[in-house]
Amino acid sequence: MAQPMLIDLEELVERLDRIGVRLCLPSKRQQIEQLEHEAADPDLWQDPQRAQSLLRRLSQLRDLVQEWETLSQQARDLLELRALASDDLELAGQVEQEATELAERVRQLELRLLLTGQYDGHDAILAVHAGTGGVDAQDWAEMLLRMYLRWAQRAGFAAEVVDLLEGEEAGIKSATVEVRGPYAYGYLKGEAGTHRLVRLSPFDAAHRRHTSFALVEVLPLVEEDDDVEIREEDIRIDTFRASGHGGQHVNKTESAVRITHLPTGIVVTCQNERSQIQNRETAMKILKARLLELKIRQRQEEQARLKGKPVVTGWGNRIRSYVLHPYTMVTDHRTEVSTPNIQAVLEGEIDPFIEAYLHQQAAEGEETAAASDR
């Protein structure tokens, strides 16, 4: 007798059909044809930023449509195989294994459909800043940095630390990471805010319980955005020698770069690259991302003001608590998702929090749209 099927393949086919409707496939295929036509223009690369933007969009659309086509065909093939597997235990086991893998890919595709923001498809800049609390807060900031680097590795993203300011005794004061990959900003944007740690301090001789805070910023990396203009007269560029742990200089040349945007007071630094030119290019990318994030936040605050709902940003936006003592629990204060497996979370297993936030935002967007239609 064949093993029972645990995955409802008929339901998967129905979900994929609904995804196809939501994708507006005829429109997507038309967009692909138009972008392919533009990509064939021999003059395209006269504007490298526009060319990169166009090719990124083309690649994302192709991948999305191809993924749906592949999953839809696989679901229907498995349905046919299941009918043949009623008396074949080996084939039934193979169908079940492939159906389980298919269900996970369908879930991931449904999640990707939630990433509809203007900048969701772009790379991201993630910055971690230690709060007040001295070495405990700096150690906590380093733990968060490691968590996000592990998450990026698990998710298949390329992550590079482009600036790092280490603490005098332990940990870090701040770090900036460039995360590259499809929809990196869309997945990470919900991580912005204050993260709180409660534990018995390893730096306290009395081993007392301490509460530490760290701030996470997430910015879209949109190099070709025309909304952000940086004029030469609006910036001041300083160079200095890159420093290591405790402020020790690790480079005899002034390769590190600090850029100050005079109108806003925003300051960015980069000291990770080998040359001053590379550090300047990276610092300019980060500055542009910060200016774009400032514009996004201003728009959000204006929309919230019109709706009568204040927007809390920065240190006042406490999004998650990580408790190591007197019990172990990670709790997201926005979605109420929690887990006692804090070690797994600190090893980068934060997908449940990311996904719950995206679903919550999508639900709130649907409620807002429904209210505006009344």
Curated annotation (Swiss-Prot):
Keywords assigned by UniProt, alphabetized: Cytoplasm, Methylation, Protein biosynthesis
Report the function annotation for this chain.
Peptide chain release factor 2 directs the termination of translation in response to the peptide chain termination codons UGA and UAA.
What's this protein's name?
Answer: Peptide chain release factor 2
The GO molecular function terms of this record are: translation release factor activity, codon specific
Q: Which family does it belong to?
A: Belongs to the prokaryotic/mitochondrial release factor family.
User: Which compartments does it reside in?
Assistant: Cytoplasm
Its cellular-component GO annotations read: cytoplasm
Record's keyword annotation contains Cytoplasm? yes
- Superkingdom of origin organism: Bacteria
Q: Which NCBIfam families match?
A: prfB (TIGR00020)
The major lineage groups are:
Bacteria, Pseudomonadati, Thermomicrobiota, Thermomicrobia, Thermomicrobiales
Question: Where in this protein does the record say N5-methylglutamine is found?
Answer: Q248
On modification after translation, the UniProt record reads: Methylated by PrmC. Methylation increases the termination efficiency of RF2.
**Pfam families (alphabetical):** PCRF, RF-1
